[in-house]
UniProtKB/Swiss-Prot annotation:
Pfam families: AbLIM_anchor (PF16182), LIM (PF00412), VHP (PF02209). Residues 394-416 have a biased composition (Polar residues). GO terms for molecular function: actin filament binding; metal ion binding. PANTHER family: ACTIN-BINDING LIM PROTEIN, ACTIN-BINDING LIM PROTEIN 2. Interacts with F-actin and ABRA. Zn(2+) 4 binds at C238, C241, H260, C263. Zn(2+) 1 binds at C83, C86, H103, C106. This is Actin-binding LIM protein 2. One of its GO terms (biological process) is cytoskeleton organization. May act as scaffold protein. May stimulate ABRA activity and ABRA-dependent SRF transcriptional activity. The modification Phosphothreonine is found at T473. Residues 269-295, 341-433, 471-520 are annotated as: Disordered. The gene is Ablim2. Keywords: Cytoplasm, LIM domain, Metal-binding, Phosphoprotein, Repeat, Zinc.
Length: 612
């Protein structure tokens, strides 16, 4: 017993010299007159009281616990041990049996009501304790085997002779034999049985336990089952309203998300209106820009084998399939450079990837500042409906470009580069409402003038070859030499105008790409002007767009709290703003491995990471 019972505190006169003051251990003041001394400590009579009730301890017994003085009644109430038989507090000797405490006089045989003699064997039948005289005698025949079985240990199989026995799983056990079947740990508290064998809680869960699909911890007690998934009742929360599911209530399961049926229907309605608005707004163009040399962008949609331009898309009725696309890919644009005189106006289509498509199609070398990439085009049997002429009011044209290896001098006039691509009507009229259009990124390729042969197989490709470059002020600057656009090999470049024998066409299946050879007269090496491919998947790698890196905490979104994200983040691809190290830590994989997953799997991982 940690507390020490003390006799009545004795009055002690002050026998020390007057020069040495005696201080009260409770109030700290000088003791004068009669004082109490307890374990070499002195107290005023009025200061020596119970810590719990404040009663005077000078006239009665007390207990000391952790330096505090407590009266007998309060100590037993707060820290005392009760007898399992009489339910009174135990003072003095105590008997412990089967995890219970008794007064020595209260631990008696359940039959004869006599205390157990010292050293006598005690028989516990699962309910009462009996002495050796009152225990059932050993019977003959079948009864003898039953009695023998009750006294045999369920673990080692030996007879339980002297000492205590433990009854569990309808068997008697030696105290040291009741162990976990897997790890061998003694089970003196809780245990879980399986097929008549005892297991500790940890091993039982490891072998037979059910994990919660929400918190991934083992489930003990009540379990909520939804399909093949199991949850703690407190872990099964609706992702929309955050409320628990009551017993017997219907549940809508989608991936790892759980919905109330009403909440799921409301979310579907919101998503449908949001997607319809996004699809309809994605084909709207802004007014034309008056900036000279700005990159023009053309909207295309591929429907089967037919290519639709912006005019065809704009002519679609609002109730047709173009407005019912289920989250289409982002409409991408194929920019090219239009050289125009000062004062000319250029219109461009603006989409969701303006900045990204423009950065992708810029060259990675400074040597491309004044270069124009030209390409071979396979002639077709049709002529375009529109082409560019100086002073044209419409400003709409189709490119008619060719590379000539002859040495004809450059013309004194400079024709404007085309500003828009338009696809003429084809002979076959497909039904444009038969299925939703598929938006494609048009690839821009480097062109090589040195190779003039056409590959017959490459004519079947559907990738468009577009004129691109940087819109400088070459048409307006007087410092530019008239031969600045000529080739270094001596073959001057033909002016950008329609030549006799050239064909204009609206579809451009390209052959083998060519590049401009050799360094030019102005000292720029065109062979080093590596053009970034514009036909790559805009979300396939980190390199297609420079995403600003933010910490993971600033990108997390939740359903209950409206989080204000940074302004310049892509809300549909928040994971792209993570650093590679933090991306690995959050998703457990690299960005390349993440991109190879299916779309539903990526969305599922983003939901778990609160980035969706």
């Amino acid at each position: 017993m940690s507390a020490v019972s003390q006799p009545q505190a004795a009055h002690a006169p002050l026998e020390k010299p007057a020069s040495t003051a005696i201080l009260c251990n409770t109030c700290g003041n000088v003791c004068k007159g009669e004082v109490l001394r307890v374990q070499n400590k002195h107290f005023h009579i009025r200061c020596f009281v119970c810590k719990a009730c404040g009663c005077d301890l000078a006239e009665g017994g007390f207990f000391v616990r952790q330096g505090e003085h407590i009266c007998t009644r309060d100590y037993q109430r707060l820290y005392g041990t009760r007898c399992f038989s009489c339910d009174c507090f135990i003072e003095g000797e105590v008997v412990s049996a089967l995890g219970k405490t008794y007064h020595p006089d209260c631990f008696v045989c359940a039959v004869c009501r006599l205390p157990f003699p010292p050293g006598d064997r005690v028989t516990f039948n699962g309910k009462d304790c009996m002495c050796q005289k009152c225990s059932p005698p050993t019977l003959v025949g079948n009864s003898a085997h039953v009695a023998q079985g009750l006294r045999s240990c369920g673990g080692c199989g030996l007879e339980i002779k002297n000492g205590q026995a433990l009854v569990a799983l309808d068997k008697h056990w030696h105290l040291g034999c009741f162990k976990c079947k897997t790890c061998g740990k003694l089970l003196n508290a809780e245990y879980i049985s399986k097929d008549g064998l005892p297991y500790c809680e940890a091993d039982y869960h490891t072998k037979f336990g059910i994990r919660c699909d929400g918190c991934e911890k083992y489930i003990t007690g009540r379990v909520l089952e939804a399909g093949e998934k199991h949850y703690h009742p407190s872990c099964a929360l609706c992702v929309r309203c955050g409320q628990m599911f009551s017993e017997g209530e219907e549940m809508y399961l989608q991936g790892s998300s759980i919905w109330h049926p009403a909440c799921r229907q409301a979310a579907r309605t919101e998503d449908k209106s949001k997607e319809t608005r996004t699809s309809s707004e994605s084909i709207v163009s802004v007014p034309a820009s008056s900036t000279s040399g700005s990159p023009s962008r053309v909207i295309y949609a591929k429907l089967g084998d037919e290519i639709l331009d912006y005019r065809d898309l704009a002519a679609l009725p609002k109730n047709k399939a173009i407005y019912n696309i289920d989250r289409p890919d982002m409409i991408s644009y194929s920019p090219y450079i239009s050289h125009s005189a000062v004062g000319d106006r250029q219109s461009y289509g603006e989409g969701d990837q303006d900045d990204r498509s423009y950065k992708q199609c810029r060259t990675s070398s400074p040597s491309s500042a004044g270069s124009v990439s030209l390409g071979h085009y396979t002639p077709t049997s049709r002529s375009p409906q529109h082409y560019s002429r100086p002073g044209s009011e419409s400003g709409r044209s189709t490119p008619s470009l060719s590379v000539h290896s002859d040495s004809r001098p450059p013309s004194s006039t400079y024709q404007q580069a085309p500003r828009h691509f338009h696809v003429p009507d084809t002979g076959v009229k497909d039904n444009i409402y038969r299925k939703p259009p598929i938006y494609k990124q048009h690839a821009a390729r480097r062109l090589d003038v040195e190779d003039s042969s056409f590959d017959q197989d490459s004519r079947k490709k559907t990738t468009w070859l577009l004129l691109k470059g940087d819109a400088d002020t070459r048409t307006n600057s007087p410092d530019l030499d008239s031969q600045s656009l000529s080739l270094s090999s001596g073959a001057d470049q033909e002016p950008l105008q329609r030549m006799p024998g050239d064909s204009l066409y609206s579809r451009f299946p390209y052959s083998k790409p060519d590049t401009l050879p050799g360094p030019r007269k102005d000292g720029l090496d065109l062979r080093n002007a590596n053009l970034a491919p514009c036909g790559a998947d805009p979300d396939a790698s980190w390199g297609t767009r420079e995403y600003k890196i933010y910490p993971y905490d600033s990108l997390i979104v939740t359903n209950r709290i409206r989080v204000k994200l940074p302004k310049d983040v892509d809300r549909t691809r928040l994971e792209r703003h993570l650093s590679p190290e933090e991306f690995q830590e959050v998703f457990g994989m690299s960005i390349e491995e993440f991109d190879r997953l299916a779309l539903w799997k990526r969305n599922d991982l983003k939901k778990k990471a609160l980035l969706f």
